[in-house]
């Protein structure tokens, strides 16, 4: 698998996803192989390696606004939510992405 699943598969349209919310620069969708009963991924539509390499403050604000909107909906519907991003060796796909999830982990 490529180092950037999100550009190579999701944004290219090769892997269809269930869109949750989309803006001009950000896409939120249901994870293709969820770890939690509710598992939504939020990504920028351009390649950004990680949170540490994001230099565009406007894009960062747009990403956080989408994460906040998704998280608020998850909390409203499920009573709680987690928001996380991985860095370094914890980051499987080298494309900045946030996970918004709820419930007990269903796979490891």
Which residues are covered by each model-predicted region?
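HIT superfamily nucleotide-processing domains
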Residues: 1-108
């Amino acid at each position: 698998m490529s180092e950037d699943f999100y550009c190579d598969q999701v944004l290219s349209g090769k892997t269809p996803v269930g869109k949750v919310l989309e803006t001009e620069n950000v896409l939120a969708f249901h994870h293709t192989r969820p770890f939690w009963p509710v598992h939504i991924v939020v990504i920028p539509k351009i390649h950004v390696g990680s949170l540490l390499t994001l230099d565009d403050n406007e894009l960062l604000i747009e990403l956080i606004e989408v994460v906040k909107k998704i998280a608020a909906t998850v909390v409203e519907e499920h009573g709680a939510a987690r928001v996380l991003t991985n860095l370094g060796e914890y980051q499987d796909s080298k494309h900045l992405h946030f996970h918004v999830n709820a419930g007990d982990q269903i796979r490891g």
